[in-house]
Design a protein with these regions (language model features):
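Extreme N-terminal, non-catalytic leader segments
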Residues: 1-42
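Small-molecule kinase domains that catalyze NTP-dependent phosphoryl transfer to phosphate-bearing small molecules
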Residues: 8, 17, 100-103, 175-219
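Walker A (P-loop) phosphate-binding motif
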Residues: 37-53
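A conserved segment at the C-terminal end of the G1
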Residues: 56-68
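Short beta-strand-centered segment that lines the nucleotide-binding/catalytic pocket of NTP-utilizing
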Residues: 69-81
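ATP-dependent small-molecule kinase phosphotransfer cores
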Residues: 79-135
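Conserved phosphate-donor/acceptor-positioning beta-strand/loop module used by diverse small-molecule
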Residues: 150-170, 176-184
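NTP-dependent small-molecule kinase module
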Residues: 200-248
Length: 248
């Protein structure tokens, strides 16, 4: 029987191996190797967000409150350094599904390029490495789908479409029609990226621990709710680590 070594399959295998490696690292670091228990401080918050919800700003507010580093575009810098390319080279494929045709055409170019799969592989490795040490906030890029559920608080920020269009229009000083196109395009690209590489529907609320409507709460209130959820997440883990372990 032929084996499928497609980029998507390879990425999934990397994610699974990385998750188990991360948990072993955390057990060893906390002196509980082989017990099924995890280090009490090895938690990560992973944000997923619809376009125009100020998800990145909320994530930074959470990081500031906790004193944790926040990785958004900073992830691109880490991946660029690993690949030995300039960060701007990755921005055209960041959270986008470029497709095989684009990659084939780029292969004929003399300019330095990075394939979508190479970027995604290094991205997954970078996120797993960060989460292995815990106490960090990661924005987008499949973190909520990639990182182990047992040690990751997975947050989704949403809002009604009209709210998001108005937010993007204000932020960029553009007309409503252009803002609407930008919101639709960004949502589509992010969705395709997650579906193609990780086989998850990013809009499915069951993939998250907390879903917040940014139109109903201020950024500061959203940050407070996330931190409150983290406190409960930690408390539940402390009281029943075996139960949390089963979340994997």
């Amino acid at each position: 029987m032929a084996h499928d070594f497609s980029p998507a399959t390879s990425t999934e295998a990397l994610v699974r191996a990385g998750q188990h490696s991360q948990l072993r690292h955390q057990e060893e670091a906390s002196g509980v190797a082989g017990t099924g228990r995890l280090a009490s401080t090895a938690f990560t918050i992973a944000f997923s967000r619809e376009a125009g919800t100020y998800g990145a700003a909320i994530a930074r507010a959470v990081g500031n409150r906790l004193g944790w580093p926040v990785y958004d575009h900073e992830l691109l810098q880490r991946v660029a350094e690993d690949l030995g390319v300039h960060q701007t080279l990755l921005e055209s494929i960041d959270e986008k599904h470029v497709g095989w045709l684009s990659e084939c055409l780029e292969s004929f170019s003399s300019a330095p390029t990075v394939s979508e799969f190479a970027y995604t592989r290094r991205l997954v490795e970078a996120m797993l490495s960060l989460a292995a040490h815990g106490e960090c906030v990661i924005v987008g890029r499949g973190a909520a789908q990639v990182l182990p559920a047992a040690t990751t608080l997975r947050v989704r920020i949403i809002a009604p479409l009209e709210y998001r269009i108005e937010a993007v229009g204000r932020e960029h000083g553009i007309a409503r029609e252009k803002a609407a196109r930008q919101v639709e395009a960004t949502d589509r690209e992010r969705r395709r990226f997650i579906e193609e590489h990780f086989h998850f529907d990013p809009s499915d609320p069951t993939n998250y621990d907390l879903v917040l409507n940014a139109a109903r709460f201020s950024q500061a209130e959203c940050a407070e709710l996330v931190i409150a959820a983290l406190d409960r997440f930690r408390a539940r883990h402390a009281s029943s680590p075996e139960r949390m372990q089963k979340a994997l």
